[in-house]
Regions:
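Residue-level signal for well-ordered, solvent-exposed loop/turn and beta-edge residues enriched
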Residues: 166-167
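A domain-level signal for the mature, folded cores of soluble proteins
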Residues: 51-157, 170-260
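Ser/Thr-rich, Pro/Gly/Ala-heavy low-complexity intrinsically disordered linkers and tails
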Residues: 1-5, 15-64
Length: 260
């Protein structure tokens, strides 16, 4: 199936206007009908979320009454190219992937996500901030993975980073049988959620998948690209197609930020 590229140029975190797409194709080309869940995130027939997250003083509530800058997370969806069987969360874009994660812990994945679809792709910006190569983990990517008998229910994604949005450095992601998946995103549960006291920028507690810019030889990055690397394709019958196939993006968080 030919994918539709949806551009979200200029859709910033603070924007209160309805979602607008600037593309020769419209969002209507993507099947965003009633969501059909096949157990995604640990739920069946999962309801879509509105993507709204509590904000305070131009940022987001942090643990212990602190305020986290809005640009410690994605501030803009630069582009979104849904793959086949995408659609879940599309009506809540872009807000559903901006700001902090809404983790569900070991047993249940977040429903505050957008499904990329089979081989779908999304590009995010953290501008005006930037991810910098500092001590240890620099970037966290949050999917809605959960554990079944201690084994990750993984929907994998390949993560790339860029400082200019043109030249990319990619963390190698080679899907395999598991139960661990190397530098792929999408296999660690997420524990941080608004109001639960777990900092979304603490890699020791937040959950999600960790990335170090040093591993790809980059000193700074302002853009993050995620591509679905799942191995489950869509059903052939149009009437049986779910809208939850592929990597389900909850959020990204900047651990080592140019402006903390």
């Amino acid at each position: 199936m030919k994918s539709t590229s949806i551009l979200f140029s200029g859709l910033l975190l603070a924007a209160a206007s309805p979602l607008a797409c600037s593309s020769s194709d419209s969002a209507g080309d993507v099947d965003a009908g009633p969501p059909i869940s096949l157990g995604d995130g640990g739920f069946v027939d999962a309801p879509e979320q509105d993507g709204n997250k509590p904000q305070v003083d131009g940022g987001f509530p942090g643990p212990d009454g602190s305020v986290l800058r809005a640009d410690r997370f994605a501030t803009k969806v630069v582009s979104f190219t849904p793959g086949d069987c995408a659609g879940f969360g599309l009506t809540a874009m872009p807000g559903v992937v901006l700001g902090p994660p809404v983790g569900g812990g070991d047993s249940n994945g977040s429903l505050d996500v957008v499904s990329l679809g089979f081989e779908g792709e999304i590009v995010l910006s953290v501008e005006p901030n930037a991810i910098v190569d500092g001590p240890g983990v620099d970037l966290l990517v949050f999917e809605n993975a959960f554990l079944t008998s201690g084994i990750p229910n993984a929907e994998l994604g390949e993560v790339s980073v860029s400082d200019d949005g043109t030249t990319w450095k990619t963390f190698p992601c080679t899907p395999g049988p598991g139960p661990t998946y190397g530098s792929c995103a999408g296999w660690h549960p997420v524990y941080s959620a608004p109001g639960n006291g777990i900092s979304p920028v603490d890699p020791a507690k937040a959950g999600g998948d960790s990335f170090d810019l040093k591993d790809v030889g980059l000193a700074r990055a302002r853009f993050v690209r995620i591509r679905d690397r799942g191995t489950v394709a869509c059903p052939a019958s149009p009437g049986m197609k779910p809208t939850t196939v592929g990597f389900d993006l909850d959020a990204i968080a900047v651990v080592n930020a140019q402006t903390p």
